[in-house]
Amino acid sequence: MGFEDGFYTILHLAEGQHPNSKIPGGMYASSKDGKDVPVTAEPLGPQSKIRWWIARDPQAGDDMYTITEFRIDNSIPGQWSRSPVETEVPVYLYDRIKAEETGYTCAWRIQPADHGADGVYHIVGNVRIGSTDWADLREEYGEPQVYMKPVPVIPNVYIPRWFILGYEE
C-alpha cells in the first residue's frame, strides 16, 4: 500500500507501544531549530502544528518517498536526509541542494509494519547485504533525535516502527 502525497504527523512507537490516534501524546518527529539540523522529536499531540509532506519519489523506486517539513508560516526548512554510507548517525533536515552537495540522499522507503495495525510503518534508509538501516529514536545531547539504526535481518529482532497519521488542520 502506498501513500498519497499529503500532510502527515509522524509518531515514534517504542517497543511494545501500540498506536492510538484518539489519545494525544508520544514522541512526534519535529525540527524545532529549522534547517541543516538533526530531526528531533517532541512529546506533542496530533493537534501539533508540526506537519510533514510525504510525497512519492518515483525516480528513487517503488515505495520511495521524500519527507519534507512545512511550518505554520508555510516555510520549508528541508527534507529528511541520511548519509548514504554511515550508520548510527542522525537524520538531518537539509534542502535538496544541500543534500546533493553533501552526498546525503533524501528518499526513504516507507513500508507497512507486520503488526496488523493500520498506520504503522517502518521508515527504511540504506539497504546493505545482511542488514538494513531503519529510522529510530534515541536520546542525544539531552534531546530525542531521529537516527539511522542498523538492524540485522533475522527473525524476532525488534524493528523500529512509526505511526503515520494524516494531518488535519
Curated annotation (Swiss-Prot):
Keywords: Protease inhibitor, Thiol protease inhibitor. It comes from the Eukaryota. GO terms for molecular function: cysteine-type endopeptidase inhibitor activity. Belongs to the protease inhibitor I85 family. Inhibits papain and cysteine cathepsin endopeptidases, and also inhibits cathepsins B and H, which exhibit both exopeptidase and endopeptidase activities. This is Macrocypin-1a.
